[in-house]
Amino acid sequence: MGAAVLGCLYSVKGSWCSGLSHVTLAREGVREETMDTKKLIGAIVAAFVILFIAGFLVHSVWLGTTYRQMRDAGFSFRPEEAMRHKLWGVWVSDALYSILFVWVYAKGKEEKPWVGQGIRYGILMTLFTVVPSALNDYVVYNLPHTLVLHWIVAGLITLILMGLAAAAILKKPSAA
């Protein structure tokens, strides 16, 4: 029997406190697991880097021509210079998404192989976040259906990569 208070794990036989080196995750007293905060932060950073790089590759490289054609046809986008000045919003959004993405994974991971968990989690999060957002944008804005499909496919690939990274970093070390 144990309890966690301010990052310290207390049990009947004594206490163990690691300051900020571990985070205690508990599920209604069913199971307690101590997770290395460095791994959690590492997974968040990896997810952020994947999300940011994928965003650049998808929107600037892969779909850049599509967006220019839409602008030339009269679709309302901010001028590129104005978007660059608001890039901080993308960083904040990507950071928040990465933190929550990894935190939810860490809270719900199971004692199963990490590769399958990472892939399943990426698919689940795509269905939970990317697909509804893309379909709502398709309904509200005059968007080509191919663009929406590209967003969904790119989101699926990105979130699977993020899921694999989080699962790989947060997996328990194998017993030697």
Give each language-model segment a name.
Residues G2-Y10:
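Extreme N-terminal basic, low-complexity initiation segments
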Residues M1-G2, V23:
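Short, intrinsically disordered, low-complexity terminal segments
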Residues C17-T34:
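Short, Lys/Arg-enriched N-terminal segments with co-localized hydrophobic residues
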Residues L9-S11, W16-S18:
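Secreted/luminal cysteine- and crosslink-motif detector
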Residues R31-A176:
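Juxtamembrane/disordered regions of integral membrane proteins
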